[in-house]
């Protein structure tokens, strides 16, 4: 399973660890993904999504129905 948020599309990025001596080594910055279930009242069922914390905040702001409509328009759910 890919480490990608289903709502925002956030994925791992690549950067550097930087030591005190300014030595640089490659590292990955992973999104803060959570597996969450949301109850959709309009459909009277639960929907499971793998969302980042930013995706959870977006769902709180717009509502689960609007977010699911966007996902279905993109063909992801």
Swiss-Prot record:
Keyword set, alphabetical order: Ribonucleoprotein, Ribosomal protein
Signal peptide position in this chain? none
Q: Does the keyword Cell membrane apply?
A: no
Q: Which domain of life is it from?
A: Bacteria
Q: Name one Pfam family in it.
A: Ribosomal_L28
Q: Which GO terms describe its biological process?
A: translation
For this protein, what is any one GO molecular function term? Answer: structural constituent of ribosome
InterPro entries the UniProt entry points to: Ribosomal_bL28, Ribosomal_bL28/bL31-like_sf, Ribosomal_bL28_bact-type, Ribosomal_bL28_sf
Where does it sit, as one GO cellular component term?
cytosolic large ribosomal subunit
UniProt family annotation: Belongs to the bacterial ribosomal protein bL28 family.
Protein's name according to its UniProt entry: Large ribosomal subunit protein bL28
Q: Which organism is it from?
A: Cupriavidus metallidurans (strain ATCC 43123 / DSM 2839 / NBRC 102507 / CH34) (Ralstonia metallidurans)
The primary gene name is: rpmB
């Amino acid at each position: 399973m890919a480490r990608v948020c289903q709502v925002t599309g956030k994925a791992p990025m690549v950067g550097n660890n930087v030591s005190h001596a300014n030595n640089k080594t490659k590292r990955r910055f992973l999104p803060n993904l959570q597996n969450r279930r949301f109850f959709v009242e309009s459909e009277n069922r639960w929907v499971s999504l793998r969302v980042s914390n930013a995706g959870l905040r977006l769902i709180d702001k717009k509502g689960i129905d609007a977010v699911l409509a966007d996902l279905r328009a993109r063909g992801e759910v």
